[in-house]
Amino acid sequence: GLAGVAEGLRHLFKTIRQGDYVAILAWLDENEAVRSLLESCRAHIGGALGVPVTLGFGPRYLHSTGQLHKGGSSAGVFLQFTAGGRADVAIPGHDYSFADLHSAQSDADLAVLSDLGRRAARVNLGEDPAQGLIEFVSILEGALAT
């Protein structure tokens, strides 16, 4: 479940100052339901905190905004979403799958952000990302209201 997430969000959001931005880093299968729920998160965060909020899907964002996240100023606050239950395919000639590769990439991205002293948190949405995001939006609304 998402127990403990509200407290973590409140702690993370208390660090945000004018000039900062929030980056939603979604390591999820991109579909209409997931995108719509993430856009809702984006609107809630931006509206409540008065800072820009970006949304990127991994691993694609690593080749564009991912460079900005790691270089330059430390104005970014990063909220990484992961989930279990991804469709998986073996990579021919290798002893790992695409899900393994995806997981390693998201782990590495979070580790680098942390190593650079960036403010970052991960939320694992469980086996059903859309349902997890529905629960998360409710938790987010509560965290932003306090």
Regions found by a protein language model. Give the residues of each.
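Phosphate-moiety recognition in structured ligand-binding domains
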Residues: 1-146
